[in-house]
A protein has these predicted regions:
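Charge-rich, well-structured scaffold segments of protease-associated domains
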Residues: 2-4, 8, 66-215, 222, ...
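Active-/binding-site microenvironments in catalytic and ligand-binding cores
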Residues: 24-26, 194
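Soluble periplasmic/extracytoplasmic beta-strand elements of cell-envelope proteins
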Residues: 14-16, 27-31, 87, 187-189, ...
Length: 413
């Protein structure tokens, strides 16, 4: 049980302390409740670009990374469809440096054309390297646009295309920052060797002077219920054929989500999994098979995927059928309580070992705070899952009319 202390500043910033005296270090994590889903459909990639711009300096801090490094620290960030996260790790006795730097860019980010052009080039190159030059690099683009027809999850975090990034202006960036990067839309968490009293005192000193301001309302178009199967074939620079079957499902923290998480573990996690025992040894066409879920706050997806040793269309069709049959079997041949217990224990071990690291804890606690979860009880919803629930949720999700099939074939030209 982790002793988590909390307070909220007058401007709405939630401040969380996780005191750990076993280390000489500390992590300062700032999580903003904004992500790619808050972009316009013709200006995608903006949230990720702004993440980069947050390191370009603020009014009183010209060199964010340089000042942090001089205090013995490092920093980084990530953007998802739902959130944007910034973190710094440094010796606990220098913790105030991180507070000063984070507060200054929350209050007064330096918007200028030079930094925008520099980071635009960096992000555009990142797009090319990750999405255009890597085998299966554009899988997320194709799969999201196949599964989501109206919801903003239909584009990836990096953006639909480089052209969107190219036309983002300084005014667009400034407006997005003003709409979303407010203290009341963020969580500040400190994990490590900094007592709660000092965390709250420093938060008051450096963040309380940032004025509260309203954030832009969120009004996403709801994804309609899928009533017919969809498919897409891509001929690309890939080493082998891949097949992905994606099924729409409910978002994070719903009962369906927790059960689906266990379903994918039973299907593909480890040598005792259904895919490993029933697909890989008996069928040499499968090079690998996997099952996973997209843990988004709003609509998610359950994915069944495989890489194949045979590049023929017939092999792809056969693999898709076998993936579907094996997953559907959970609805007709109930799993055992022992299988569920093993899956829950694996998940609990993963959570426990992951939280041994103070940086991982800082990020996880920040996320659970924004999601209004009890961090110390995150495993509890899984403990009551039954074989009957697994069968029921399998029937709800794995349905022929909800299939979204994406097949990659190696280019032959």
């Amino acid at each position: 049980m982790i002793d988590i202390r909390r307070t909220t500043l007058s401007n709405g910033l939630q401040v969380v302390s996780d005191y750990d005296s076993s280390t000489a270090m500390a992590a300062v994590n700032v999580l903003y409740n904004v992500g790619a889903r808050d972009e316009c459909s013709d200006m995608t990639g903006l949230a990720h670009l702004l993440e980069h711009l947050m390191f370009g300096g603020s009014v009183n801090v010209a060199d964010f990374d340089g000042e942090l490094q001089r205090a013995g620290g490092i920093s980084n960030a990530w953007t998802s469809n739902d959130y944007t996260n910034f973190y710094a790790v440094l010796p606990a006795h220098n913790i105030e440096t991180a507070f000063r730097l984070e507060s200054d860019r929350m209050l007064s980010l330096d918007f200028n054309e030079k930094t925008l052009e520099t980071q635009r080039s960096v992000v555009t190159e990142e797009f090319k390297q990750q999405c255009l030059n890597q085998p299966y690099g554009d899988l997320g683009h194709h799969l999201r646009s196949l599964v989501f027809t109206t919801h903003p999850y239909k584009w990836p975090v990096i953006g639909k295309e480089p052209g969107h990034i190219a036309r983002i202006t300084l005014d667009d960036v400034r407006r997005f920052f003003t709409d979303h990067y407010a203290p009341g839309n963020a969580v500040l968490c400190v994990s490590g060797n900094v007592p709660p009293k000092r965390v709250f005192s420093l938060a008051e000193k450096w963040f309380s002077g940032i004025p509260a301001r309203p954030t832009a309302p969120r009004a996403y178009r709801q994804e309609p219920v899928q009533t017919a199967a969809r498919s897409l074939e891509v001929n690309g620079n890939v080493p082998m054929t891949s097949v992905t079957l994606a099924f729409p499902m409910q978002g994070y923290a719903t009962r369906q989500y927790f059960v689906a998480d266990i379903i994918t573990d039973i299907l593909s996690n480890g040598e005792s999994s259904r895919f490993f025992r029933r697909l890989l040894p008996s069928n040499r066409v499968f090079a690998q098979a996997d099952a996973s879920i997209l843990g988004s706050d709003e609509p998610g997806m359950l994915m069944l995927s495989a890489r194949l040793t045979d590049n023929s269309p017939e092999a792809a069709d056969s693999a898709a059928s076998k993936l579907l049959d094996e997953a559907s079997r959970l609805a007709t041949e109930p799993v055992t309580q022992r299988e569920i217990t093993r899956a829950v224990n694996r998940l609990n071990s993963s959570l426990t070992f992951g939280n041994l690291n103070y940086l991982a804890r800082a990020q996880a606690i920040s996320l659970s705070t924004l999601r209004c979860e009890d961090f110390n009880r995150m495993i509890e919803p899984y403990r009551s899952i039954t074989p009957a629930e697994v069968a029921e949720v399998t029937r709800e999700i794995i349905r022929p009319e909800r299939i979204n099939r994406l097949t990659y074939f190696p280019r032959t030209d």
